[in-house]
């Protein structure tokens, strides 16, 4: 059990928080595997290069990740007063979300289950 006053506990928790600019998309309608193809391409790159990669990537996940990356850049500029030229993609990952289960009718009265997977995508930036 935690000791101390509630405000003291909150103060300590906030002191340990990660202050790097980030953006998160929850319940994105793309599977983790498909999102990771794009995320692997931009990990470790500077933000201008990463934006170029996701802009010209034909995958559907790249449109979601481009929006997320632009949001993280705006957070870095407005909330953390960081310079855009020095930013790079420090972390980017996709975690598994819930799965929507659907039924597809098949031949001779059978039914197949269709699983529409979701993911939670996170992009974290940092300065070099």
Give a label for each model feature.
Residues 2-94, 118-128:
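Ribosome large-subunit tunnel/peptidyl-transferase-proximal elements
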Residues 97-128:
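Strongly charged
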């Amino acid at each position: 059990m935690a000791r101390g006053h509630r405000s003291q506990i909150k103060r300590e928790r906030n002191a340990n928080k990660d202050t790097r600019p980030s953006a998160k998309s929850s319940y994105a309608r793309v599977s983790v595997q498909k999102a990771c193809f794009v995320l692997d391409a931009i990990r470790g790159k500077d933000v201008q290069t990463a934006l170029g990669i996701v802009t010209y990537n034909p995958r559907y996940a790249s449109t979601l990740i481009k929006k997320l990356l632009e949001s993280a850049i705006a957070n870095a500029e407005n909330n953390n007063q960081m310079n855009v030229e020095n930013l790079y993609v420090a972390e980017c990952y996709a975690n598994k979300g819930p799965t929507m289960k659907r039924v597809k009718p098949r031949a001779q009265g059978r039914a197949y289950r269709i699983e529409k997977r979701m993911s939670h995508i996170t992009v974290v930036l940092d300065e070099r």
